[in-house]
Amino acid sequence: MAGLRGNAVAGLLWMLLLWSGGGGCQAQRAGCKSVHYDLVFLLDTSSSVGKEDFEKVRQWVANLVDTFEVGPDRTRVGVVRYSDRPTTAFELGLFGSQEEVKAAARRLAYHGGNTNTGDALRYITARSFSPHAGGRPRDRAYKQVAILLTDGRSQDLVLDAAAAAHRAGIRIFAVGVGEALKEELEEIASEPKSAHVFHVSDFNAIDKIRGKLRRRLCENVLCPSVRVEGDRFKHTNGGTKEITGFDLMDLFSVKEILGKRENGAQSSYVRMGSFPVVQSTEDVFPQGLPDEYAFVTTFRFRKTSRKEDWYIWQVIDQYSIPQVSIRLDGENKAVEYNAVGAMKDAVRVVFRGSRVNDLFDRDWHKMALSIQAQNVSLHIDCALVQTLPIEERENIDIQGKTVIGKRLYDSVPIDFDLQRIVIYCDSRHAELETCCDIPSGPCQVTVVTEPPPPPPPQRPPTPGSEQIGFLKTINCSCPAGEKGEMGVAGPMGLPGPKGDIGAIGPVGAPGPKGEKGDVGIGPFGQGEKGEKGSLGLPGPPGRDGSKGMRGEPGELGEPGLPGEVGMRGPQGPPGLPGPPGRVGAPGLQGERGEKGTRGEKGERGLDGFPGKPGDTGQQGRPGPSGVAGPQGEKGDVGPAGPPGVPGSVVQQEGLKGEQGAPGPRGHQGAPGPPGARGPIGPEGRDGPPGLQGLRGKKGDMGPPGIPGLLGLQGPPGPPGVPGPPGPGGSPGLPGEIGFPGKPGPPGPTGPPGKDGPNGPPGPPGTKGEPGERGEDGLPGKPGLRGEIGEQGLAGRPGEKGEAGLPGAPGFPGVRGEKGDQGEKGELGLPGLKGDRGEKGEAGPAGPPGLPGTTSLFTPHPRMPGEQGPKGEKGDPGLPGEPGLQGRPGELGPQGPTGPPGAKGQEGAHGAPGAAGNPGAPGHVGAPGPSGPPGSVGAPGLRGTPGKDGERGEKGAAGEEGSPGPVGPRGDPGAPGLPGPPGKGKDGEPGLRGSPGLPGPLGTKAACGKVRGSENCALGGQCVKGDRGAPGIPGSPGSRGDPGIGVAGPPGPSGPPGDKGSPGSRGLPGFPGPQGPAGRDGAPGNPGERGPPGKPGLSSLLSPGDINLLAKDVCNDCPPGPPGLPGLPGFKGDKGVPGKPGREGTEGKKGEAGPPGLPGPPGIAGPQGSQGERGADGEVGQKGDQGHPGVPGFMGPPGNPGPPGADGIAGAAGPPGIQGSPGKEGPPGPQGPSGLPGIPGEEGKEGRDGKPGPPGEPGKAGEPGLPGPEGARGPPGFKGHTGDSGAPGPRGESGAMGLPGQEGLPGKDGDTGPTGPQGPQGPRGPPGKNGSPGSPGEPGPSGTPGQKGSKGENGSPGLPGFLGPRGPPGEPGEKGVPGKEGVPGKPGEPGFKGERGDPGIKGDKGPPGGKGQPGDPGIPGHKGHTGLMGPQGLPGENGPVGPPGPPGQPGFPGLRGESPSMETLRRLIQEELGKQLETRLAYLLAQMPPAYMKSSQGRPGPPGPPGKDGLPGRAGPMGEPGRPGQGGLEGPSGPIGPKGERGAKGDPGAPGVGLRGEMGPPGIPGQPGEPGYAKDGLPGIPGPQGETGPAGHPGLPGPPGPPGQCDPSQCAYFASLAARPGNVKGP
């Protein structure tokens, strides 16, 4: 045991060393998911696109953005629109999330105009990728990419502009729609043209190329260009072709290092195998591999490599973990593709079959694999062999090596001939490859009907070419032929001198593009390239054009610098009311403004909320002085405005002034009914331009203007500041299947840690299930040559590991002769971790785990424990399923204000435009500067009183009222539920019955059922425990002999005897028959997640150990917290490996818990069927000391006797006559197992005899064997409190008891179901203020309350909705006279108003009375179940009944059913989970190794994979063995032979040993003196006694005092109440 513990500690230290060094290096994964871009969309918004199609463009941009990870440090997106000139819609750095960019894309505005693509290309080259516009420095982390979308030919030149963009490092993808010229698109796009040009027929089709464009974008950024011969691919002309990919022959310099060989029939090739071909992955794939690619190679096996297992190509990381590989298994004739998985460690596909077998001959073959997102296809010799599905792959880690041609198990270079090996970044190229480079390949020689380009005239005979099948070119010499017909158009000439502007002719059909002509030579030769000219002077302004069509509303520009304060403009029409704003604090007093001109009469303003006629208010604060105008005629009565902000006034009463100038614009209110329209005033002069307003709603389309003459092209204007995003567009067309989504969170397997020091060897683990064959590990460093070791034990065949990196090349040695087979070397160090095995079959159920810590006893129902400490952050979850398409987000907040644009030149004054429809109200403008103070206006006329307003809306809830008077007492409540049974007063013990006859020998009992074995495991006094939990079923015994004994004759019934003195406590009875398994209880509420458990000990417990532990533990088991996890269930799906947990500190030894209270006994279960006999166990070692024999009555403890020799099992004798118990003798030797007896047949039930006279109390006899369950007897007297027993099996629900006395409140139980609504209870006292509730539904209108007292003046209210015209109000009090105002212009004559009657101020009303009670509230949730009530008063003692007649001994019952595995699992969890940890830790600490023999446990389920171990120290080099062929994985071998028997250890302290079989009954001892013990279970009824005389009934005792119930004891009293009446004692 000590050795095991030492090994466990060493193993833990070793794991800690490995784990603590695990944070050193992060994997650097590279691929499509890790490349980010500065991406600019260049969108044609010319007139040929049209508004409807531009809507599809907006949606296309949004859909394409959805395939990128957008963020400040990820991909940034900008948009530039162009037609006549380019403008920036939004810059690269403006939006930081995908949703913001998509929303902005859907708001892009359409311009219309010409198509100047060249100008747009120059614009993005100079501006869009600059740091000022959000661009980032160009490096390999951020790629500058532009995607151009156009639908027509450019009206300026594009070639030079595109070349400048390419030189600046901008990769351009050109997408043409409809009539866009492919030749022009190719001039614009980057190389290779075929990968950067897309063309679709119309705008409906642009979304179909979205996925293809996204893949090309990744491929072309990750992959360099490779030049290949044209005859490599089908459907192409001869010559060279540029495509994206990796030519591994060039990248590894294979031909330069190994030298090339020529074969006349084919291309040159290289003979591999003499030197390892290895390169750093960062040098080969600096950006990783694309998501889809094609691997193509032309090679042939050599004699030595045909049957090898090797990698033709492999990428490994810095820890030699494979990232991607292609394996050729010569022995099994298979091709295997492996890669790192996104959801699992590795994914792979294996190709086998007759067509794959052909690859392994010694001919030349072309092998191509097309690796796509969800499948892999294998092509051999240009024919598709098979397509297999594959799971999602992860990007490769580029911090490692890439190898060509190495053996799997030792990384030795492989001998084979290699002609070419290339990776194309387009997976389709695997099927486009031809086989013309294979001598025997299917390359048909057929002449292509397409003629070659015509040769130049007067060409002498030269070698020509003809096209053949698969476009293989064959050179031949041809004489010049006769003159042919006129050839196709010649190449385009040099540009001619610029001609005059001609009239625009009709659009001609596009002609074919001519080939580029030779550069012409001028008279002085070709001149040098001139310097770039300066910007030209601005051209003269063109003539004013005719009025154009009304344009679309422009994008909102950024706010310009504030202009000078303009003159006050004419009063505009009233805007729509804005939404009510919050009440602001009163502003500072403004200075007096200059006198303004008299404004026109405004339209009718908005009324406030209608109110009831109020009392005459106190005098309001003086309003601000208005601009005085001349006396006009009396106008209409205006609506009552809110109180104004206090103005600067002289504190004297003045007359009412004229209507003031309009105040500052209020927040928009809800729309009111239209007011009466005032007369139209004279048109005011144009004011200076105000501040830039916010964008208005789109106006109606104006009438088409007269087309204007084409003006001269002006110089490009300065760049405008970007406007805010426009409103979202309508949903676009459904997109095609999207590009693979963003990478999920990192997988569970972390990166391997740094190399730590070599730790001590770990302890041997339990034998796991054999995994799949792994790949070979790296070869260790060669150690010193060791001596040949002795023959080791035969080990299991190791799994095949993955080959490691090749070592440095050695000099080729002289080939030696074949040596003799060496002796078997010592076992080598373990190899590195192989690939993760696939999911194995379900392993056998492991033993139960070690228990959790015990808690002190808590009564039922179990309360949740205190919240554990916060757990450490869990591993990231698996990526979730893609969510449903979200609804378009709301408009994002306005972006930050950009820098002010350069001030433009003042434009010529345009002709006035046609009057547009009134615009929607603009947002509140910035407040203008304060004007000088205005003069006091003249007093206004008294207004007419307003009409009564409408009834106001329901006011806010008042504050909580004072508590009302206590209501009358309610009706009596419904009868309560029956309470628990009351506790009776302790009665006197009854008379002791006669001893029963001994019963027949029973079958072997389970845990805790054999007398004397309950508490003797640790020595000391044996006290009978209560009934234990059902043990694990033993093997069934054979049928026992029938019992002996004859029932006595029934005696006559005697009268009841006098009350006897209390007898001494009887001996324990045998346990009764096993009750049925209780039904599963309702599942408890899930508890809080606990802290990580302490690590368990390494040894496992067998079922036998569990028996013994349960036997020891079950005697003193308080009900604890929830038990340990149950036995393993069916094997689940393979989980994601978790990170290794930190090692917890070793817990201190816990003290033994206090004795628990007994649970209520269960009801007897149904009889079970006989189980099958179990298999014989292994022969155990001889035990040092057996368990004590059947104990007699309690005597003084004797000294342990010496171990006796093994006795021979004697035949079981008949039961002896009962003797008196003797003193406890020394334990006898353990006998062999007796043969199982044959169960007797069930006898008929005997008839009840007449009661006999009471006999004399006899001495306590030996307890009889368990008899059949008798009829329920009368309740006995209360026994003494016994020791706490183990909880019995869960019983079924008992019947409802009678109502008990009111108990103390219990702890909160779980929420019960909602009960029926009870009668209304009496009114309770007022509660405290509760926390604010959630807003309720609007209630019904209440009855009008009485008039309240007048409140104080409120702050100015918000503008109200337009109300109906009110009645004339009372005249206000005389106002303070204002200052003299400047006379205004004459106003329009107003309508005469009517004078209203003055109102009378009412008195203050009395306070209103208390309102009516509200409706009953919604029924509350049912409260928690209360605590158990206090103990009821004891009932009166009943009279002692006469003893019942003893029945005849029954025959043994049939064997009970074995409990179900579910019941066993639950019982073991409940029993072992309570005290096992502290007891087990204590026992293990006390035991010497000799007591820890345990039976072989079953293997547990496979644990999570550990981290990769460090390479072990170099071992001594063994003698070279003959390399064997890698065999397939064999079945697990049989368990090896048992080791030699160890020496006998010293006797240790009593421990948990394996339990022996039940020995034969010992010789009955002498009767002992009566002892004191707990009451036993009822024995078998004795023979019928004579009938005794009837006794006098006793007087009922006085009632006892009311009991008190400690909450911790409630479960105990509940168990008493639920006990059967015939059970004595606790």
UniProtKB/Swiss-Prot annotation:
Tissue-specific expression: Restrictive expression is observed at tissue junctions such as the myotendinous junction in skeletal and heart muscle, the articular cartilage-synovial fluid junction, or the border between the anagen hair follicle and the dermis in the skin. It is deposited in the basement membrane zone of the myotendinous junction and the hair follicle and associated with the extrafibrillar matrix in cartilage.
Give the record's glycosylation annotations as residue positions: 375
Where in the sequence does UniProt note compositional bias of the Basic and acidic residues kind?
544-553, 591-606, 769-778, 815-826, 945-957, 1131-1151, 1173-1185, 1241-1250, 1391-1404
The record places domain Collagen-like at 481-520, 526-565, 566-625, 657-708, 714-773, 774-833, 868-922, 925-984, 1047-1095, 1118-1155, 1156-1215, 1249-1308, 1315-1374, 1387-1446, 1495-1550, 1575-1604
Instruction: Report the principal subcellular site.
Output: secreted
Stretch forming the signal peptide: 1-27
Q: Which Gene3D superfamilies match?
A: 2.60.120.200, von Willebrand factor, type A domain (3.40.50.410)
Q: Where in the cell is it found?
A: Secreted, Extracellular space, Extracellular matrix; Cytoplasm
Tell me where in this chain the VWFA domain is found.
38-213
SMART domains referenced in this protein's UniProt entry, alphabetically: TSPN, VWA
List UniProt keywords, sorted A-Z: Collagen, Cytoplasm, Extracellular matrix, Glycoprotein, Repeat, Secreted, Signal
Which InterPro entries does the entry link to? Collagen, Collagen_superfamily, ConA-like_dom_sf, TSPN-like_N, VWF_A, vWFA_dom_sf
According to the entry, every stretch annotated as the Laminin G-like domain falls at: 239-427
The Pro residues compositionally biased stretches are 571-580, 715-728, 742-751, 1440-1449, 1595-1604
Q: Which GO terms describe its molecular function?
A: extracellular matrix structural constituent conferring tensile strength
For the region Disordered, what residue ranges are annotated?
A: 506-1002, 1019-1103, 1119-1458, 1491-1609
Q: Name one GO cellular component term.
A: basement membrane
* Compositional bias (Gly residues): 1405-1414, 1521-1530
Query: Which SUPFAM superfamilies is this protein grouped with?
Result: Concanavalin A-like lectins/glucanases (SSF49899), vWA-like (SSF53300)
**Similarity remark:** Belongs to the fibril-associated collagens with interrupted helices (FACIT) family.
PANTHER family per UniProt? COL_CUTICLE_N DOMAIN-CONTAINING PROTEIN-RELATED (PTHR24023:SF1112), COLLAGEN ALPHA (PTHR24023)
What is this protein's function? Acts as a cell adhesion ligand for skin epithelial cells and fibroblasts.
Name this protein carries in UniProt? Collagen alpha-1(XXII) chain
**Species name:** Homo sapiens (Human)
Q: What lineage is this protein's organism placed in?
A: Eukaryota, Metazoa, Chordata, Craniata, Vertebrata
